[in-house]
Amino acid sequence: MTLAASPARERVVRPKRPRHLSEAMRCETAFRLILSECLEEVATNHEALSSGDPAALHQTRIALTRLKAAIAFYGPMVADSEWTRLKSELKWLSAYLGATRDLDVAIENSKGLPEERMLMTARTDAFEALREALQSDRYWQWFDGMWDWVGSGPWTTRQDPRAAQRRAVPVSVFHARRLAQWHGKLCHKSRGLQGMGKNKRHRVRLASKRLRYAIEFSEGGLPADVYASWRNVLKHLRKGQQLLGELNDDEVRRKLFESADALDQGADEGKARHQRVHERKRKSQLLRRAAAIYRKIAE
């Protein structure tokens, strides 16, 4: 499918919003501030991303993950039919971003190795597809649609008393309750981490990211002493996320090599066997360290 290219267009310069929330702020105001910051980050990185900058790609993916975390955090308060449509479009965009980012990570971990050239070629192809997507009308319709939804989507005008009440709840009340819920769910999901399969482990990693970002954008919205306790959880979450991320990167890299037949096991079975032993040992070490971190998160 060929994507229609969007002509050069003059983007609206949007004012910078305050970074932090306040305890008395209404939830609907806080939600708009958080989502606006995420979208501004996407816009800031767009030009560099379209030029192939790996750092801009990474920052764009973080901004979009934060955006999805915020929408999940506010949940029924903001979910509506328009978000369902926009979420589907975001999934389309994320597929291009993810394919290119996976190759960036694999290349970084393969410097000087024989497979580096193969990965560079695959990265060029993946980026061309990403750039075409970023220049398409479909992308800009999604991006402008997100701004419209944040400012005046169906969620903003629901008239039933419960919806209006939810939107008006102070940040300090809602965030304290919601963070506790998410923390409890993560503690439950992370039990038995060392014996988990990759799918369950992936869900722990996603839940970790969401809780991490939720804590980060709660700064200012909770009393200082309450936020201090979450800051300690945040420190462990970052470390746990790093370890699970390394495991994920290893698995992605292995899949890339397998799909491209990078390892000729018939010709060099000894080398392949040595590589598998090394991978199992590294995986065991990372899982052991991650399990210790998640026990601290649950304390």
Regions found by a protein language model. Name each.
Residues M1-E299:
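Function-determining surface determinants
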